Amino acid sequence: MKEPSERLIDMLGHPYNQRNVQALLQSFGVKHMPPPNSYFNDDIIWSVKTSIRIDIYRAPKINDLTGRKYTNQDGWIIGAIHFLAPGSDDRIKAPFPGKLPNGITMSATPDESIKAYGQPELYEECWWPGFSGRILAWRKPGINIAIEYADSEVDRVMRSYTACLIGCIGAWRDDNPDIFAP
């Protein structure tokens, strides 16, 4: 049987249904998932209890961003799933408690992630105000995966695992279009 994280990632490109997502996360104690609440073409749905962020888009916007046709209806489509750990956002107090795809967890090292997913298409050391670390990213059929590691005093710590339909890092489309543009 698939892990909840894998089943959630399988929802990418499908309409956001708060009841289905809640049922999937029920084993983590989630009793309610909020509906979309945005006047714009995108919204963020948080499940702080499970350290998950879901990016959703109106169908015309995700169709335009990806160059694909996910649906003709003007509903909300899941475009990205973020499994988070402390340091990724002020709301997040504990790492995502479940297993991630390919058997890794939020405690996986960069080498363990590379072993699980193969050589990344993007392997970047980053230093910007308030952050230093490493970003690993893979392009798989129909999905992009990005794992961000923050430098700590002793090691590198995973602070986010993102699976998305479009560039999981906004700049990918401009910086590495040969790899990550739709």
Language model: regions and residue ranges:
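Active-site-proximal segments of catalytic enzyme domains
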Residues: 95
